Amino acid sequence: VQMQTEVLDHLKKEAPELSFPNIVNANNGKSIIFINGFAIRLLTYLEGDLLTNIRRTPELYCDVGRFLGQFSQAMRSYSAPPNSDGSDKLWKLDEVLACKEYLPEVIDEDARDRIARLFDVYEKDIAPKLPSLRKAVIHGDANEQNFLINPDDPKKITGLIDVGEMQFGCQINDLAITLAYGLLGESDIKMASKAIISGYEKEFPIEDKERRILYYLMAMRLVTNIIMTSLAAKQQPDNEYILISQGPARALLKKLEQENYIQL
């Protein structure tokens, strides 16, 4: 929580054009107080509609990338404190191999086979490259449920919320995560991904070694989604919605292979 608070203060100074929740200090002037052993923090409310409720256009996709790229650039000047690795290892993209033990929980045989092959490629060709990538604190969950839109100007991102998954990691992960969620249900993934990446690079150019593995990292975020929802379905067998909601992730992962964004 302390790291998240510091990042929000940092963004207010380094990237005031980006709209994030602001910290409201308590009466004693502190940003975090403790009550009965619990850390309490108050954030301002951001107006706007969720991106998930808005019809997507190339211009909007590009602005998603623009906003995220400005965030990535701003985080280059922030020094991450120790122990800033995020709260849940299973959802941390740099630690995606931690999900592998739960692969048998994936019921769909086609998806399970594809994920197994993807894990093999990731372990052999992708994971060894991670230590050389640029690192900083990342948002960790920049998805369509957290980007905000002005309904009167639906081509522009007005804010980003939910900083609870902030963590220190490979900066390219933020773009991979946004692509993974932003392209769910999208029929033209070439148009959408090109627009998001273009907007991002106008603010924060991607290095060649990041570009070569970007779609694999995107795919691994989909893997995390599929495996974790499969595990949740086992723990909540009466909740039929859980497996229904993972359908778009399975479909997008399949499309990434079929259209040669990833080679398995």
Language model features with spans:
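A conserved alpha-helical element in kinase catalytic cores
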Residues: 1-38, 59-62
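Active-site acidic catalytic loop and adjacent metal/ATP-binding pocket
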Residues: 23, 123-172
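A cross-family kinase active-site recognition segment
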Residues: 27, 54-110, 135
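A glycine-centered beta->alpha junction motif in the catalytic cores
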Residues: 40-54, 96-105, 224-239
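All-alpha amphipathic helical-bundle segments outside canonical DNA-binding/catalytic cores
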Residues: 59, 208-218
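An alpha-helical support segment within catalytic cores of ATP-dependent transferases
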Residues: 80, 98-140, 150-152, 205
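ATP/Mg2+ or Mg2+-diphosphate-binding catalytic cores
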Residues: 102, 225-264
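Active-site activation/catalytic loop segments of kinase-like enzymes and analogous catalytic loops
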Residues: 171-205, 219-237
